[in-house]
C-alpha cells in the first residue's frame, strides 16, 4: 500500500472519522432503448404516461426519442440508490404498451439513419435548444452511434472529509481548490486503472451486424446476424464506437481543474472547418447550435467527468469554474444484460471501493502515461480475456492478470474500511467476486454473454430480446405498491404541467436565445 493511501486510511479509520465513509453520495443514470415486441427500435413517441422528458426529474430521454434515461436521486447508501432505480424501472415498464426495455448496451436492429427519431422536448426555448443540439450530434457522428446505452455512476466523497485531509496533510491550498485538486487526482488514477472496470464489468462482446452500416472493421462473424470479437469485453467502449476527427485532438489535461476547464472552453469556442462548411442552418432550419469543435461541453466523450450541480441557466463549465468539483460521473460502464437494472449491489459496492482507492492513492501527473492509459483501455475492451494479454505499466509490460490481482489486493484495504464503517462484510464479498473473475475469465459478464449465445444458438438480437422479455416479466411480477404508483403518476403529471408553463411563459425568438446561450460561454472565456 502506498504511504499516502495507508496514511489516509488510518486517518479515516479513527473512531471519530470512520462514520464519514457512510456519507458518500451515489446516483445512477441508466439509459435503455425502447423496442417493440419483435425487438426493433420503437418508433412511437415517448409515452405521455411517463411525463415530460424536459422537466421530469427521474425519467427523460438521451439522444433518441426511443432512448430512455432513468435518473435516481442521490443517496448515502447505494442499496437505496438501486432501490430507487428499481422503482423507476417498475413504473416505466408498467407504462410501455407492448414495448420492452432493451437489455444490453449495444442497440437492437436499427432502421436506416433517417428513420431513427431524435428526442423531442416540446416548444419552449430550452426544449428546442435540446432538439437542435441532437440534430447537430446526428450531423457530426451519425444517429446509429447515439443509440448505444450505458450506465453512469455518480459518486462524491463527503464535504466534511476534505478539510480533515487538508489539515492532516498541511496543504496550503484553499479548501475549494484542495477539494477540486483531490477529485482531479482521483480522475488521473481512474485513467490509469479503469481498464480493470472494463475487464470486470464489460458486457458488450457482440453486436447486431447491421450496426456498422457496412463499414469495414476488425470484428469477426459470430453468425449471420451477429459480429463479435472472441476476447472482447466492451465493444461499446472500443474505437468502433464514439470517435470522430474533430474530437481526436481534444484530450483534456487532468493536471488540474483549470487546465481541464480551459481545454473545454477552447473546444466550445473554436470553429471546426468541416462544421463551418455545413453552417448552423439549412433552408432556414437550425441543424446545429454552432460550428465549433463542440456545440456544448457535454458533447465531449470521456469515460469520467468532474461535475458540479448547475444552477438554472448555468453551463457545466461555468459551475466548475465558479465553485469547483463536487462529484465525479463514471461513464464507461456497460449495462449487464443479465440484470433487470443493468447493475447490481456487488458492482456498485466494488465501484465505491475502487473510486475511494483512486481518490486516496498517490496520483502523480500522467505526463508520459497518457498514451499507455489509452492503449491499455483499448486493449482490454477489445481483447481483455485473451490469455496472457499484456498491458503497459510505467512503460514496462505487465500481464493483465498479475496487475489486476495486485490492484484488487490494494483495493482490499479500502473495501475493509467501508465494511468497518457500515458493518458487515458486503464490500469484501463484492471484492471476492471480482477476484474470482480475474482467476477465471469465464466468469466475466462478457464471457457469459458469448457462452449463453453459443449454448442456445442465439444471435445477439435473439439473446437480447429474450433477456428483455424476462426482465419485463420480472417487473410485471413485482409491481409498485399503490402509493408508489400514485407518486410516480403525480410526478409525471406535474412534469407535463411544468413543461406547459415553460411553453406559455417565454419571450423573444429562438435565434436570440441561442445567441445568448453561446455568449454565456464566450463571456466566460473573456473574463
From Swiss-Prot:
Alphabetized Pfam families for the sequence: Glu_cys_ligase
Q: Which GO terms describe its cellular component?
A: cytosol
Keywords linked to the UniProt accession: ATP-binding, Glutathione biosynthesis, Ligase, Nucleotide-binding
Reaction(s) catalyzed by this protein? L-cysteine + L-glutamate + ATP = gamma-L-glutamyl-L-cysteine + ADP + phosphate + H(+)
Instruction: Supply one GO BP term.
Output: glutathione biosynthetic process
**Source species, domain of life:** Bacteria
Does the record's keyword annotation contain Oxidoreductase? no
Q: Which GO molecular function annotations are given, in alphabetical order?
A: ATP binding; glutamate-cysteine ligase activity; metal ion binding
Q: What is its EC number?
A: 6.3.2.2
Pathway named in the protein's UniProt entry: Sulfur metabolism; glutathione biosynthesis; glutathione from L-cysteine and L-glutamate: step 1/2
Assigned protein family: Belongs to the glutamate--cysteine ligase type 1 family. Type 1 subfamily.
NCBIfam families xref list: glu_cys_ligase
Please give the name of this protein. Answer: Glutamate--cysteine ligase
Its lineage reads: Bacteria, Pseudomonadati, Pseudomonadota, Gammaproteobacteria, Pseudomonadales
